[in-house]
Amino acid sequence: MADERAASFTKRSIKSSSKLSGLKLALSMVDLTTLEGKDSPEKARGLCRKAVRPWERDQEVLEERLPSVAAVCVYPSLVDVCAADLRGSGVKVASVATGFPSGQYPLEVRLDDVRRAVRAGADEIDMVINRGAFLAGRYDEVAEEVTQTKRACAREDGTAAHLKVILETGELETLDNVRRASDLAIRAMASAGMPPHEHGGDFIKTSTGKVQPAATMPVTLVMLEAIRDWYLETGEIVGMKPAGGIRTSKQALHYLVMVKETLGTLPDGDAWLTPDYFRFGASTLCNDILRQIAWHKTGRYMASYDFSEA
């Protein structure tokens, strides 16, 4: 059933003007990510430059300045580098923590990982749940770990970093498990008793990008429905981040159509069509979006070397 509903969103016809607006919106929702063993301060700085100015030739070729992306996502050891480079830019610094990507480290080690990243300047923390505990039915344990992680996002000034809870849906085996994990994560974040964010909110996220399958439309639809039902119950907005496997502009537009038709009719439905509450975790997507924008504006495709790889 979810497969059929998700497939229906790929059949919508989008007008050219709406498509261009959608591409720019999708660009503003990208979390540029590098999570490799060979990451370095130099690579992180390149990622930051790309995040602030996705295409350095935009004004020359398009006669307009394209939006920055939403965030860069790095390991905790590179948070301070990115925080310094992005200060005042509006681009957020996100960091994976909690024993990414396995989630199998002792809880106190994972919480210390979060606190260090927040102190270093992280605006957002992408945590990963312990799938072994979840699949063994230890739901209270998983929920408590999410709650404790949310509390570890607190800053000394009374604010807190935003939290994205990665479910690693490719390891959850069934869509019923995806729904249960979504509900669990949303309620566990809410039970932390943290003050509301001034801008944006906390998220649930599909994947680490290290496991296949990563983000799929049926999985994302199930998670969006959990977000919708929580909103109808409480009035609280929770964000959504599909991550991994979204490589083309066409795919990104399909996801935005799904968000619009699933959440857009709610009283605050437009909120999910902003980077505050919807993100794409897909670095390779960025340049494909830029190529498509260039084609819509100029009638010609740019070569891959026209865009930096960060």
Regions found by a protein language model. Name each.
Residues 284-287:
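Short, flexible loop segments at boundaries between secondary-structure elements
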